[in-house]
Design a protein with these regions (language model features):
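Flexible, acidic/Gly-rich N-terminal and inter-domain linker regions that tether
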Residues: 6-97
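Conserved Radical SAM active-site core
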Residues: 64-191
Length: 191
């Protein structure tokens, strides 16, 4: 199973904004296995998609490019907001706390009744650039006590949530993961 590595394309451009966009657009995914004929097996959610070259998995945001799996939604927030922790709904964990809620495109379900269908099923993998360090800064600037990875399925934006959560923890913020739970044991143990 491959471990995660950041794409080094930033060195190829002098324009920082373009460089940041390239890095965010081609972030190597966590938890995948190389297969025969250039295919990769995504080991993040329980679907364990077998993805052909130049194709995406069921979630539409994990793409095989030449035998490397990329998270197309890394650092691209489709929804950001300050919420009370009770909205997550967590009533006994840090009652009264405010959290910075962050979502990126993609989901491993297709629930017809989903409140967030428009952002979770976005085929364009839209969103504004909102790198992990900016997520933490925005949370601190908004007097939030934590960050919640929510609205869409955070398992599908694991790399983004993982990097943000590490920085948040270092900054003294707590993290919550509002998930459908359809992930692999490897995802639960990811480091």
């Amino acid at each position: 199973m491959k471990s995660r590595n950041s794409c080094k394309l930033m060195l190829l451009n002098k324009n920082h904004l373009l460089s940041l966009w390239i890095v965010m657009s081609f972030h190597e995914a966590m938890l995948y296995e190389c297969q025969s004929e250039g295919k990769v097996k995504c080991c993040l959610c329980a679907r364990r998609c077998l993805i052909s070259d130049d194709s995406t998995g069921f979630c539409m945001v994990r793409k095989n490019q030449g035998g490397t799996l990329y998270a197309l939604n890394y650092g691209k927030a489709v929804s950001v907001g300050v919420d009370p922790i009770s909205k997550k709904p967590l009533s006994h964990f840090n009652p009264g706390a405010l959290v910075m809620s962050v979502a990126a495109a993609g989901c491993n379900f297709r629930c017809q009744f989903c409140d967030n269908w428009m952002i979770s099923q976005d085929k364009e993998v839209a969103g504004r650039l909102f790198p992990p360090a900016e997520v933490v800064k925005a949370a601190k600037d908004s007097n939030c006590q934590g960050i919640s990875y929510t609205y869409t399925e955070p398992t599908i934006f694991m790399e983004y949530a993982y990097d943000s959560a590490k920085l948040a923890h270092e900054a003294g913020l707590f993290n919550t993961f509002v998930s459908n739970g359809y992930m692999t044991p490897e995802a639960v143990k990811a480091k």
